[in-house]
Amino acid sequence: MGFLKFSPFLVVSILLLYQACGLQAVPLRSTLESSPGMATLSEEEARLLAALVQNYMQMKVRELEQEEEQEAEGSSLDSPRSKRCGNLSTCMLGTYTQDLNKFHTFPQTSIGVGAPGKKRDMAKDLETNHHPYFGN
């Protein structure tokens, strides 16, 4: 009775093992020799590949030229500044002053120690209730 339960499993496993043994990881040498060379390209494919490579190289050259132009424009913009700032400390001081000014002009957020909140509002209410004569 137990043999009948395992017989389909046995048949399937034997078939799988037979198929696994039949498959080979490396193809036969005759199939490699009979197939046309995969590495060889036709004349049209070679021309297309050469055109693609040439277009890619031209695109990269244009990108590099644009980057060089942008760098040249950037250095020309900085040249009056370099003429004005003969001393490095003067330039750095000016830069830090500008950054500090930008920092102070940012809008204030309601986060942090001095932020308005429930506790501060309650404290103000207590002060106004304890000293009613200061309010008016």
Curated annotation (Swiss-Prot):
Where are the compositionally biased (Basic and acidic residues) regions? 118-130
The UniProt keyword set, sorted, is:
Amidation, Cleavage on pair of basic residues, Disulfide bond, Glycoprotein, Hormone, Phosphoprotein, Secreted, Signal
**Subcellular localization(s) per the UniProt record:** Secreted
Tell me which residues are glycosylated.
87
Provide the residue span(s) of the region labelled Disordered. 64-84, 114-136
Please describe what this protein does.
Calcitonin is a peptide hormone that causes a rapid but short-lived drop in the level of calcium and phosphate in blood by promoting the incorporation of those ions in the bones. Calcitonin function is mediated by the calcitonin receptor/CALCR and the CALCR-RAMP2 (AMYR2) receptor complex.
* Protein name, per record: Calcitonin
